[in-house]
Amino acid sequence: MTEISSMVITHAKATVEEMEDSWHGDIDLVLSQLYSNELVYECAVLKTCNRVEIYVVSSKGSSVLFHYAKEMGVSAKIVEFYDHDESLRHLLRLACGLESMIIGEDQILGQIKDFFLMAKGAGTVGKVLSTAFSKAIQVGKRVRTETFINRGAVSIASAAVDLAEDILDGLNDKHILVIGTGEMGTLVTRALSHRDMHVIYLANRTYEKARDLAEELGGEAVMFDQLEKYVRAADVVISATSAPHYVLKGDLVAKVMEGRENELLLIDIASPRDIDPAVEEIPHVILRNIDGLRVINEKNLQMRMVEAKKAEIIIDDELDMVKAQYKRQKADAIISNLYSQSHGLRHNEMEHAINKLSAYHTIGEIERKVLEDLTHAITNKILAEPTKKLRNAAEYDDDKFLDSVSRLFDIRPIKKNDGITK
């Protein structure tokens, strides 16, 4: 039987560097690599600044992911493998913000939706993963409506700003440079705009995007090729681009710091990292990345733990419902195949009988309709009781019965992407 398995690497066990080392290529490439495996029926990938997660639907369970992790050189110390039920629970908890570094944060829900749509667009998800991800998105919304799990929660972006405030004992008289005006950079700028900043510089490779964000939230847009000038002017640099390489290299920062005695705080919340870790060796430079945000999370964690317990109750309830849905799907796939094969045989035999009768009598539309209705009714009545038994078996997890019926009626494997059994 084909079910969901998942491979999860997160901030809980892995450092930023280890997560970078575990990722090879862009999302489309990874989806393509996974889906090209004949044992994988469906697949989806989640990749954020503090997690890499892969979900597959396969008759071989986690063994497909064990092999993939080995090929990618992923250390066993940082990866978790989940079976079907564990994968479902994890995905629901993730959508509710319970697996996030910042418990209850809202950004993860949008990320799950985006990555699901990406896999859908690539044609790598079918019925099984669509059910799981749709349920996760629904539950994430329900938990945020029925609890206060996200009250007081901060995003990675606002946590970066809070961290800067803690390290520098306030930001009121500071010059801040934000590099990157994508989703994360916009969130950083928005968090800064709520504070009384001296000046915020916004840098992006596409100047117009920086200019538009500066006009919307306040700040000064700067040309990307003048980065050195504005790093020199800044007290804090928060970098959040999607570049595949370092945006702030060691030699640039070293040049900026020549003769400078006041500290320069660099906060890197990009994935992969934007800032060369070697800059930490430069005098008066303070470097922090995702790993350093844990302290901020601890500050407001306690107030959300009561709400987290309420969320767990909702998750338990919704998990039971989605598991029941999968049970129905399991039986429905066999039933659909059974009806399809049976009616195919019925139609062929009816046509054979009509051809024989046509040798002796003229078979008109009325006679053909009578034979069609008769054979259709007989076939459906014969299948009615087996259908009931199959649905009962699925409800009570009687996989042996389901498998026996499949073998008895020689129900052939379904095509890749239908995703219930193989």
Swiss-Prot record:
Pfam families according to UniProt: GlutR_dimer, GlutR_N, Shikimate_DH
InterPro entries: 4pyrrol_synth_GluRdtase, 4pyrrol_synth_GluRdtase_dimer, 4pyrrol_synth_GluRdtase_N, GluRdtase_CS, GluRdtase_dimer_dom_sf, GluRdtase_N_sf, NAD(P)-bd_dom_sf, Shikm_DH/Glu-tRNA_Rdtase
Molecular function GO labels: glutamyl-tRNA reductase activity; NADP binding
EC number in record: 1.2.1.70
The UniProt record lists the keyword NADP: yes
Active site: 49
Binding site for substrate: 48-51, 100, 105-107, 111
Reactions performed catalytically: (S)-4-amino-5-oxopentanoate + tRNA(Glu) + NADP(+) = L-glutamyl-tRNA(Glu) + NADPH + H(+)
SUPFAM superfamilies for the chain: Glutamyl tRNA-reductase catalytic, N-terminal domain, Glutamyl tRNA-reductase dimerization domain, NAD(P)-binding Rossmann-fold domains
Keywords per UniProt: NADP, Oxidoreductase, Porphyrin biosynthesis
Pathway: Porphyrin-containing compound metabolism; protoporphyrin-IX biosynthesis; 5-aminolevulinate from L-glutamyl-tRNA(Glu): step 1/2
Site (Important for activity): 90
GO terms, biological process: protoporphyrinogen IX biosynthetic process from glutamate
Enzymatic class: oxidoreductase
Residues that bind NADP(+): 180-185
Note: During catalysis, the active site Cys acts as a nucleophile attacking the alpha-carbonyl group of tRNA-bound glutamate with the formation of a thioester intermediate between enzyme and glutamate, and the concomitant release of tRNA(Glu). The thioester intermediate is finally reduced by direct hydride transfer from NADPH, to form the product GSA.
Reported function: Catalyzes the NADPH-dependent reduction of glutamyl-tRNA(Glu) to glutamate 1-semialdehyde (GSA).
UniProt note: domains: Possesses an unusual extended V-shaped dimeric structure with each monomer consisting of three distinct domains arranged along a curved 'spinal' alpha-helix. The N-terminal catalytic domain specifically recognizes the glutamate moiety of the substrate. The second domain is the NADPH-binding domain, and the third C-terminal domain is responsible for dimerization.
Subunit structure: Homodimer.
Family, as annotated: Belongs to the glutamyl-tRNA reductase family.
Protein name: Glutamyl-tRNA reductase
